[in-house]
């Protein structure tokens, strides 16, 4: 958006990595990126991001509700496309990818060690914020099988596109650019 272009079109115009283009196009198509960009809803935004890690590629499209007055950020839905070469076990790979998304939402929106006067305030798990079932949005995962490639890393790659996609969606919703994790709700109404 800072470049004066649609975020998807900007990336597609500048990406030379065919595998990244493929996951980005797959996620955007299933998410309905172009249609959603046309119909704007107040206090809602969409964002996308893509990346590569350990020989795998991933793209995520996200919808959020972000309210500046209350500082509330809620992820409403995530569509990710993931390609890690030849898929050996599709059911396990999908479970791994979706587990990565849920784990990453914690670090994106909630998880942090809090300090005051050099002391840890949330030294117990009971005081450490992690996602609850109610925090988990609808997740759609598209697996792109590439039997022509060797199997590559599937452990953490699905995590890398979620935080920037959520941050981009928050910016789309309320024009506030959050650049550090967790995305702090207080920053929305500062």
Segments the model singles out, each with a brief description of its role:
Residues 1-190:
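Cofactor-binding beta-sheet edge motifs in enzyme active sites
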């Amino acid at each position: 958006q800072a470049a004066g272009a649609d975020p998807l079109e900007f990336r597609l115009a500048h990406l030379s990595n065919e595998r990244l283009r493929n996951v980005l196009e797959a996620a955007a198509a299933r998410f309905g990126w172009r249609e959603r960009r046309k119909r704007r809803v107040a206090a809602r935004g969409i964002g996308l991001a893509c990346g590569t890690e350990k020989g795998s590629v991933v793209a995520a499209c996200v919808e959020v509700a972000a309210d500046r007055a209350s500082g509330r950020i809620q992820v409403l839905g995530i569509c990710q496309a993931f390609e890690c070469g030849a898929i050996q076990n599709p059911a396990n790979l999908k479970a791994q990818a979706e587990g990565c998304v849920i784990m990453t939402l914690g670090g994106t929106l909630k998880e942090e060690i809090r300090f005051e006067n050099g002391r840890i305030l949330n030294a117990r798990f009971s005081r450490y914020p992690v996602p609850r079932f109610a925090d988990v949005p609808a997740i759609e995962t598209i697996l792109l099988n590439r039997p022509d490639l060797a199997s590559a890393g599937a452990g953490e790659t699905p995590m890398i596109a979620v935080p920037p996609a959520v941050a981009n969606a928050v910016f789309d919703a309320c024009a506030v650019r959050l650049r550090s994790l967790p995305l702090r709700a207080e920053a929305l109404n500062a």
